[in-house]
Design a protein with these regions (language model features):
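Solvent-exposed loop and capping/linker segments of extracellular ligand-binding repeat ectodomains
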Residues: 1-311
Length: 311
């Protein structure tokens, strides 16, 4: 039977470990029973509508094992893990809708409003039982302690088309060029790495197999990027949207060939600079240096690449 298995690292000052499993108006019969084990201390619980199952532990400092077992699948977007959760060490159960019991197409492993911000490690086979997932919207958003992920993390997700905000405001310091290799249906990467303040560079082949990808709005906005690989978009779909893709970063030069053959429909604020200069209403002086071929390749696109239209 598949269980959710995590490691919880407790310090000297944060010894209260709390697990919450909220419920809405309806709970699917297949998800109304849960067994929780903390370092071998096991308890069984019957979940009630409009209430939360709350479990508290007071362990000694160190690393502890937490197991959550719903008897098969687990409810998506529901559990609130202990804030001291540092690792997920086995594949997660299939994600099902908590109210209907049906397969969930959205990859929300925990309650999106309460992510485990101290999480540092994900097992590479995390999604082995969730090949049905379509949308990875905000799945790992806000995980500020997560500095890297396995390059094969998304390999099982052959139907995934949306990666909106998947790592937004996370602590990623680098990403593998293989990260999205298996996601041949991917179309939307908007805000995928937005606000990643420790992400200084990206591989040229990051989207090399994503030939259907066409939405890159704010994908790297407000990240720490200082340069862009010229071949980053060489294989993506034509007529895509690039609104604020690299806005408010430290990029100083737009490489030749970046937008060749992409025929974008919108580049509004694509390279809007983080800083403003006096008497520079279109941010031309503060913006990065563009090669002439950028303007040739985007001449039919809507918007100004150095300044986002405000309405």
């Amino acid at each position: 039977m598949t269980k959710f298995v995590a490691e919880v690292t407790v310090g000297k000052r944060d010894r209260l470990v709390t697990l919450r499993i909220p419920a809405g108006n309806t709970i699917a019969p297949s998800l109304n029973q849960v067994t929780v084990s903390f370092d071998g201390q096991t308890s069984q619980h019957h979940r009630e509508p409009i209430s939360s199952t709350v479990l508290e532990y007071h362990p000694m400092p160190g690393t502890h094992r937490l197991e959550i077992d719903f008897g098969g699948p687990m409810p998506a977007a529901t559990i609130i893990l202990p804030e001291q959760t540092t690792a997920i060490i086995s594949p997660i159960p299939a994600l099902h809708d908590d109210a209907t019991g049906m397969l969930s197409t959205a990859g929300h492993i925990w309650n999106p409003a309460k992510p485990p911000r101290q999480l540092t490690q994900l097992v590479s086979s995390l999604f082995a039982h969730n090949t049905h997932l379509v949308a990875l919207s905000g799945t790992f958003a806000g995980l500020t302690a997560l500095t890297e992920v396995p390059e094969s993390l998304f390999f099982p997700l052959i139907y995934a088309s949306t990666f909106t905000g998947v790592f937004a405001v996370s602590g990623l310091t680098h990403v593998s060029r293989q990260l999205f290799t298996a996601n041949l249906q991917a179309e939307d990467f908007s805000e995928a790495f937005m606000g990643c303040k420790s992400l200084h560079s990206i591989p040229a082949g990051l989207f090399s197999t994503n030939t259907h990808a066409r939405i890159f709005d704010r994908t790297f906005a407000e990240s720490a990027l200082g340069e862009v690989p010229a071949a980053l978009f060489s294989n993506v779909a034509k007529r895509g949207s690039f609104v604020e893709t690299f806005a408010r970063t430290q990029i100083k030069h737009v490489p030749e060939g970046l937008m060749t053959d992409t025929e974008p429909v919108n580049i509004d604020g694509m390279f809007e600079p983080a800083e403003r200069l006096p008497h520079d209403p279109m941010n031309i002086k503060a913006a990065p240096v563009f090669s002439q071929d950028f303007f040739d390749a985007t001449r039919l696109a809507t918007g100004v690449p150095t300044k986002r239209a405000r309405f």
